[in-house]
């Protein structure tokens, strides 16, 4: 019995062909009997397409019926006039004639976005001359044909200094397919530091898109990226060591070879400064800290201390000063120690003892747990950050929860919450609790200070 062909359009899976001057379309006829089937093609305006551009393939017998394909290769300018352009596939068969529109998904013309990534100072390496790379990326463009080139001071660079990747399709969302390419230019450290101008050019659809860059663009104060932050001593540091540690934090360093951090007193006298430098961060910058210590009495007197940062990337030294804040409200904390809940003890697993520290100002406070007069490992307790009191935002509270075994608590072991704050008469208070008393007991604070206090000279 006879069977009419079913027609299906064939288009390229790639919305932008390697040779964008040519367009290939096809037509599939399947499930027909008997053979043969004859193909012909017409433009949208019904004029015939020359047989020189048509390639017909032999029928294939499969599943008891035949299928055949026809392909047409045309200059893109012949049909790419608008987004709704198409050509028509015609077939003749003993069962009659059929036709099928074959539409081309027209590749949109999108210009490239050109960006240049400059090398960080510490990226230059190798023997003399030390070299690094400028990286130019053209992205978001379509169609895919693009030509990348570099200029130095307006003149083309040597081709051997340039490496350009293959054009790649970008991850496709709901929009059209776009492309990306990366071009790298090898430069010497001297070329970069001499403030020469480099230009990356992208030639796309007859238009040139470019970006210029030089080290002079990076040389002003706001572009060095170097920032200085002063960290005052914590009460815990002052309480435990009877000295105040001053910290000068420097961020955004491209290199640290020329870095100098120094602390000085109000009268200009230099303080011994210890500098620690971090490992390189993911953005290829470094962080440094400059530490100096002064006596507790000197810090509490309100004396001003100054940190000075010098670096080859800075046009002039950066200076910032730090002193103990004046006219700060001093309110000593109230301390409450709460025994574990009975519901928790019934589980016979662990016991949570809570130390509630309330109504204090300023917010810097020190909380430590002790057992048999010795500090408990901090991994066994957690202390919250100071939080404003809901009914009095000028005052703060924290809570610290110590977790011990149910066995230790039930055996009558005593645990102490030690709280340090500058508004307390002796800077510290201690309250203990155990199963027997079931309520906190105030201890002599001198016992706590005897092992931790030190003398500042």
Curated annotation (Swiss-Prot):
Residues 106-220 are annotated as: CH2. Residues 1-105 are annotated as: CH1. Residues 221-326 are annotated as: CH3. Residues 327-457 are annotated as: CH4. Glycans are attached at residues 45, 113, 212, 276, 283, 444. Disulfide bonds join 27-89, 136-200, 248-307, 355-417. The keyword Glycoprotein applies. The keyword Nucleotide-binding does not apply. It comes from the Eukaryota. Keywords: Disulfide bond, Glycoprotein, Immunoglobulin domain. It holds the Pfam family C1-set. This is Ig mu chain C region. It comes from Suncus murinus (Asian house shrew). The lineage of its organism: Eukaryota, Metazoa, Chordata, Craniata, Vertebrata.
């Amino acid at each position: 019995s006879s069977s009419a062909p079913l027609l299906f359009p064939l288009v390229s899976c790639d919305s932008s062909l390697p040779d964008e001057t040519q367009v290939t379309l096809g037509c599939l006829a399947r499930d027909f009997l008997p053979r043969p089937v004859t193909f012909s093609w017409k433009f949208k305006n019904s004029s015939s397409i020359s047989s020189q551009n048509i390639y017909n393939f032999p029928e294939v017998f499969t599943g008891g019926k035949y299928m055949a394909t026809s392909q047409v290769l045309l200059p893109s300018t012949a049909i790419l006039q608008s987004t709704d352009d198409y050509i028509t596939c015609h077939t003749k068969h003993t069962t009659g004639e059929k036709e099928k529109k074959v539409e081309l998904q027209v590749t949109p013309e999108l210009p490239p976005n050109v960006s240049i990534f400059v090398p960080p100072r510490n990226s230059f390496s190798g023997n003399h001359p030390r070299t690094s790379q400028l990286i130019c990326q053209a992205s978001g463009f379509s169609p895919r044909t693009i030509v990348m080139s570099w200029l130095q001071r307006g003149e083309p660079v040597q081709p051997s200094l340039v490496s350009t990747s293959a054009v790649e399709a970008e991850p496709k969302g709901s929009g059209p397919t776009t492309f990306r390419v990366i071009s790298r230019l090898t430069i010497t450290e001297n070329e970069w530091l001499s403030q020469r101008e480099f230009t990356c050019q992208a030639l796309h659809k007859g238009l040139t898109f470019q970006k210029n860059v030089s080290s002079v663009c990076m040389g002003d104060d706001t572009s060095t990226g170097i920032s200085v932050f002063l960290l005052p001593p914590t009460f815990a540091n002052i309480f435990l060591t009877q000295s105040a540690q001053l910290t000068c934090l420097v961020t955004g360093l491209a290199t640290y070879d020329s870095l100098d951090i120094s602390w000085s007193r109000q009268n200009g006298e230099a303080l011994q400064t210890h500098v620690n430098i971090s490992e390189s961060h993911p953005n290829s910058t470094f962080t440094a800290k400059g530490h100096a210590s002064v006596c507790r009495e000197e810090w509490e007197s309100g004396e001003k201390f100054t940190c000075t940062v010098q670096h080859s990337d800075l046009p002039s030294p950066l200076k910032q000063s730090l002193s103990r804040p004046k006219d700060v409200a001093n309110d000593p904390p109230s301390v409450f120690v709460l025994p574990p809940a009975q519901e928790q003890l019934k589980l016979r697993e662990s016991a949570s003892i809570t130390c509630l520290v309330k109504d204090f100002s300023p917010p810097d406070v020190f909380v430590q747990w002790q057992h048999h007069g010795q500090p408990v490992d901090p991994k066994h307790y957690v202390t919250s950050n100071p939080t404003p009191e809901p009914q009095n935002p000028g005052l703060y509270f924290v809570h610290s929860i110590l977790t011990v075994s149910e066995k230790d608590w039930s055996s009558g072991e005593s645990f102490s919450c030690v709280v340090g704050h500058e508004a307390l008469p002796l800077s510290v208070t201690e309250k203990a609790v155990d199963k027997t008393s079931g309520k906190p007991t105030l201890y002599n604070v001198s016992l706590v200070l005897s092992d931790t206090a030190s003398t500042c000279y």
